[in-house]
């Protein structure tokens, strides 16, 4: 295949697609260039059908070279995918999965590799476009193209594929995907936006999606391959009819049992009995394994059909609820002792239960994110764990999988919209949700439990957040929207539409569907039902705890802040962290300083915080002209005295500024260690401070300033040379050498006394101690 190039202008950038040049052994491959972002997508298919499910794998690989960066770590090589890469892979998987035929069982891999990265041209948009197009032009049986875009909302306007600056200004971060006819994937975080605004964003996004799909269709028409003939899994229709006729009523009775565990037990017993009958019947048949495989599919289909029939025809749900009814709710705080943990919330909805635990820490404990974008600190983390015991099973135990990462991220988006600013609450915040029981909607239970934990822990959130999962049963013509779906309705339904928010608006959306797409009318109805349900849940949460506690838990670190000038940050930190380490060692606190000069001090001991704050204040304190100090004499020279104002800030009192009367000897007025009152008279551009004692004493009546003698010109023209003060000069050189050796060490305020001495000789020649030349 020869190289082909296609281009359009889309959302303010050039979108270019190249085919036929690279990865030619894959079933389908494209290079997508969007702005300066380049993504290579390759799609491949296994030769044979495998297993009893569709093994689709979508990867999104972030190569650090794409941003001109080295990977971190000892090996300097990309390792496991980042959280963002995992979420992007899920984002692509969800809209393309429904586009494969029922019964398709060949393994399919779609690998997206980011080759160059432009932060203002979304890699996930390019990868989703490339994934669909690589499948569409290949011989892999892919039903129809999909595409996705990002949507922002600024000042009442929807913006497609916003830049970084636009994202920062936006009250909405939405990813929406679909086919030419309908939306089939939604992922969003929002700052309490109304249902109407969110629906408008979805429609604006879908209109943009249609443009991308039309572009794909043009490319497929020119370079698309003929689709391969693959074997789809079809059950024996005679066997199906036989089983339904003999056992459908038994399975219906089991499915209609309202309590989950009893229903599961009864359903399992019916299925096992049927399998036992047919295992014995076909014991000697060489196709027994195929018969049993078909039988499992038939029984699953019978259960699927009965659940949907009950809902659409009888308007009865498996647990007996009405279509828009929420399961029984319960909320509790302080599940664990407050003198140990920082805040806990236990939320129960029917047989779904989540425990969320809050931990607060200094900002230096925040997660450092180093990906294709610039490194930054992530302040808020929401982690979701789903142990197998929550559904009464045994199973894999280990690192979180894609599902757990995705559910944690959804809760994070929902809750971060109501968190106080860093200035208001300078803590790193971690919530961990442990799913203790699950019968559907556990991610939304984790959001409700997280709200309880935040409020119980004293985090001043703007408003409580609740989440609800909406479902859909549709036959293509008629549909039913379900409120608060349970596991069976999720498994056999067509949609899982999660909506989280406050009383003022939506903070997060996530939608997965198993059909090709849903209409705006269904979305509007689902959002309206979700709002009603959300308010009911908020009633229960607010009845448990109406407002965030005013005090943190006794176990939580206390905090105080002090804002320091940006140019003083290095003073507090010190060379190699020497100064800040000294403060920490002396007081036992933790200190975090951001780039704006906000210094946060953490400790469980308020006295330690106060002491550290005092030390920092002294380090960054600056003398100002006109201020008066009780200063200690720390060094005496023939031309004046050096006094300490505070901390390491010294000032010089010239001999002429000690008294109104002429002073012949400095020590006639002050002694080393004396405390004297001085007034700041001048601060030069190098930060050297001149002070006066006599300025605080009333000038004697008839006082006349002594006449200044003109300065004699020296032949060599350099007032710093000569023999008059060699001994003292050498002493000054030692101080200056010390200063140079220390570099920029924080807090070193030693004076370059030789220059100061020359300055005095020049302005007050009558006081000069230099020998005449």
Curated annotation (Swiss-Prot):
The Swiss-Prot or TrEMBL record lists the needed cofactor(s) as: Mg(2+)
Please provide the Gene Ontology terms (biological process) for this protein.
mRNA catabolic process; RNA processing
Question: SMART domains under this entry?
Answer: KH, S1
Residues in domain S1 motif? 626-694
Identify the residues that the record assigns to the KH domain, covering every copy.
557-616
Per UniProt, which keywords does this protein have? Cytoplasm, Magnesium, Metal-binding, Nucleotidyltransferase, RNA-binding, Transferase
Q: Which NCBIfam families match?
A: polynuc_phos, PRK11824.1
Q: What is this protein called?
A: Polyribonucleotide nucleotidyltransferase
Per the UniProt record, the source organism is Lactococcus lactis subsp. lactis (strain IL1403)
